[in-house]
Amino acid sequence: APTNITYGHNNRSAQFRLPQNRYCIENRAADMTMNVYLALSMTISAAVEGIEKKIHPGKPTDQDLYNMTESEFKKLGIKRLPKNLLMAIEALKNDKLSDEVLGPVMKKSLLAYKNDEWERYHQAVTDWEVKEYLRLY
């Protein structure tokens, strides 16, 4: 899955892919665990905001992003998507567009649910932890 905020034409490593042989936009960062209604409403709202405010998306990125270094990302001005759920929660908290699109009640509820999910995730013991620490102790 893409890890950077980018778009490209036939680039499967970009967050948004605009295939040149079809009239469509693929959101490659979305996954099957998302709420499709919230994801679609935020994606469309962000697109509309970009059009209305004439926000230039930058140049398309058509090189393989999976093989680029951090310094190459910085040189091209490419930002990272959140690396984990906690970082995503913080990004959502600070996002002004989501205030408008989701409204205060939905946003507060979503943040509470995702914070609870993060806490439950950290209470689980993973297979890696069992294997790693049982061999040491």
Regions found by a protein language model. Give the residues of each.
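Catalytic-core signal marking the mid-to-C-terminal active-site face
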Residues: 1-137
